[in-house]
């Protein structure tokens, strides 16, 4: 059975989707990208969007949405953890749960290259774009850049990543490129 926090979250998403933008506008942003030790310690929460649900020995560790959100909220509350990287659905849920206050928030941008598919390297930007990250008041965007010298789709992904870095820079946002 869902606890009250998740019933409220589902109600907001289904009946009042504008509350996501309202919560983003109210969110207290961090004063720096770095924690008190001069480091950026982020929790990565963009793996489920590619169907990667394993954590350790648990093949479906990230399959239960409420358990995942509980674990992410707990991790974000730990000393020294000052940020999260995630897809729109995860970040919006964490935002509605109040877990992103004073946290560095980086949105995942390209999630189209699903593992094991013929279009895996043709990794389209199917999540955030720079304008939506700026509108949400998030600190940056992250993209995955995989190079396959035998796949002609690589060049389109390289070009799209370059364009995304420029668009993030135009909005004065952090760009993270994962090799």
Please annotate each region the language model reported.
Residues 1-124:
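Alpha/beta catalytic barrel-like cores
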Residues 108-171:
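Hydrophobic alpha-helical segments and helix pairs
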Residues 169-179:
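Histidine/lysine/aspartate-rich catalytic loop segments that bind and position anionic ligands
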